[in-house]
């Protein structure tokens, strides 16, 4: 038996050497520039995603490679990455059917949702069934519902924090329960009362943050996902305590969806699962599990991203008096009784017309990015970038963050400057500046809930900053500077978020 060990070792070395030679010289990707070690092995990415620094650092490594090798590089044995702000909208255009990677679709354990659908054709069918719920017109109809959530939040602030100068509010938590309540109601048709949780610390919203931490482990070792799914729920919850809160939320909604499937008033619609059950989708697309995954994916994806954007905006409004003062001047023209914490709020139609408020939201979107991870896809047809042709079936990707820090488009790009969005500005190439705001991505897989997210941001900022004053507490720029990729952007480990105290009613 032992005499086979040298033979096995030689066989293994021969295979490894042959694989390296193929990847360096014979692979369809061999012609693309980039570091040779990354072309040979995917362990470079694994090391930087899991072990280097605080993890999630590969995005910064291949940024350095781009500076050395150019705008198109090979970042691992099977993937080409492009860094060119002008090409983002072209690559992810609505006219180009692109496929998600099957192993990445399994990372969040929701393969039946539109978010994780691999096939562009199936994705189109699934998206069409619910897209009418997220049109601008439909969101406008729900303006009062969004305002009601913000009014409930304002009441909580007045009851529990107003007059208690030393009580600290984590704005990240506050905005998370606001967005989660709204999105869950939109998805499931139920008010969950996240806003009513003590200190705005809801188990569900906390779970969303913590469950993204092992994202790269699942991406680098997809087989782990299958193993974990096979484990009993009790074991999973022991290994990851936040899974218990998430599973409790899932179980409650599965029962609710099952009831909705047979409800007499299902035709009234208004939720994602009623839209699915009432659609012309084939029967296999109307299963309770698929409807549940669709709604849950939307709720999970929308809650944290909107809250992060609102937290970035809140920091800068509290950090820079000039920005706050200019917003106050604009709001004074539309808020009827701006001296009262009970001031009635303008309609969404009016808020959408405010240029400086729009500039604040656009800057917050630009500096919160939406997704911090690269967006890998494949195509059945060749992709042409300058003189480079990416063959069919080869993985290619781009990121949002580099475009948002392209100094040709956004000078002084790390500074928060709402005024850069005023007076219909143009980029260096003559295109509207908004064409380079990619927080909601682009193409057929762009964010389904964009209009709802924007409505939440407009109403949230106006309601809070018309009604309240606060002071930053033990918070600085490092708490909104994102230095880790966890699919969503993350600040340094140890950051406690954007925190404030000394809450008072607004005085003009």
Swiss-Prot record:
Protein name: Cytochrome P450 monooxygenase orf4
Protein induction: Coexpressed with the other cluster genes on brefeldin A production optimized medium.
Keyword Heme on entry: yes
EC number: 1.-.-.-
Cofactor: heme
Gene3D superfamilies in UniProt: Cytochrome P450 (1.10.630.10)
Function: Cytochrome P450 monooxygenase; part of the gene cluster that mediates the biosynthesis of brefeldin A (BFA), a protein transport inhibitor that shows antiviral, antifungal, and antitumor properties. The proposed biosynthesis of BFA involves formation of an acyclic polyketide chain that is differentially tailored throughout the backbone.
Keyword terms, alphabetized: Heme, Iron, Metal-binding, Monooxygenase, Oxidoreductase
């Amino acid at each position: 038996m032992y005499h086979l060990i040298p033979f096995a070792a030689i066989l293994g070395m021969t295979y490894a050497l042959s694989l390296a030679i193929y990847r360096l010289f014979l692979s369809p990707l061999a012609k693309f520039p980039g570091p040779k070690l990354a072309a040979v092995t995917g362990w470079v990415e694994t090391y930087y995603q899991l072990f280097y620094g605080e993890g999630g650092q590969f995005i910064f490594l291949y940024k350095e490679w781009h500076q050395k090798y150019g705008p198109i590089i090979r970042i691992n044995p099977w993937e080409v990455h492009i860094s060119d702000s002008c090409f983002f909208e072209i690559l992810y255009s609505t006219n180009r059917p692109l496929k998600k990677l099957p192993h990445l679709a399994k990372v969040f354990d929701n393969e039946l949702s539109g978010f994780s659908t691999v096939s562009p054709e199936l994705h189109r069918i699934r998206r069409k069934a619910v897209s009418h719920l997220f049109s601008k017109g439909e969101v406008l109809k729900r303006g009062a519902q969004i305002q009601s959530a913000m009014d409930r939040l304002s009441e909580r602030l007045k009851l529990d924090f107003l007059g208690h100068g030393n009580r600290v509010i984590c704005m990240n938590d506050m905005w998370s329960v606001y967005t989660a309540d709204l999105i869950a109601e939109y998805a499931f048709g139920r008010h969950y009362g996240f806003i009513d949780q003590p200190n705005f610390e809801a188990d569900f919203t906390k779970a969303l943050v913590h469950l993204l931490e092992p994202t790269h482990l699942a991406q680098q070792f997809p087989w782990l996902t299958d193993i974990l799914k096979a484990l009993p729920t009790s074991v999973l919850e022991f290994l990851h305590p936040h899974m218990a809160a998430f599973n409790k939320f899932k179980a409650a909604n599965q029962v609710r969806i099952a009831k909705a499937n047979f409800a007499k008033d299902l035709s009234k619609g208004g939720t994602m699962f009623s839209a699915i059950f009432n659609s012309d989708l084939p029967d296999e697309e109307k299963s309770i599990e698929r409807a549940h995954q669709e709604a849950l994916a939307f709720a999970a994806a929308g809650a944290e991203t909107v809250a992060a954007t609102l937290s970035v905006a809140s920091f800068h409004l509290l950090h820079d008096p000039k920005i706050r003062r200019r917003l106050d001047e604009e709001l004074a023209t539309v808020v009827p009784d701006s001296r009262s914490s009970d001031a009635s709020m303008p309609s969404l139609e009016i808020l959408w017309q405010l240029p400086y408020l729009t500039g604040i939201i656009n800057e917050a979107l630009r500096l919160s990015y939406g997704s911090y991870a690269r967006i890998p896809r494949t195509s059945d047809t060749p992709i042409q970038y300058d003189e480079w042709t990416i063959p069919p079936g080869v993985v290619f990707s781009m990121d949002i963050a580099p475009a948002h820090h392209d100094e040709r488009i956004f000078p002084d790009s790390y500074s928060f400057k709402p005024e850069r969005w005023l007076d219909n500005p143009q980029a260096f190439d003559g295109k509207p500046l908004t064409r380079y705001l990619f927080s909601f991505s682009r193409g057929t897989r762009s964010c389904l809930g964009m209009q709802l997210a924007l409505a939440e941001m407009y109403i949230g900022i106006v309601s809070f900053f018309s009604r309240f004053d606060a002071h930053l507490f033990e918070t600085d720029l490092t708490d909104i500077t994102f230095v880790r990729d966890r699919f969503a952007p993350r600040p340094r480990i140890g950051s406690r978020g954007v925190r404030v105290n000394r809450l008072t009613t607004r005085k003009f």
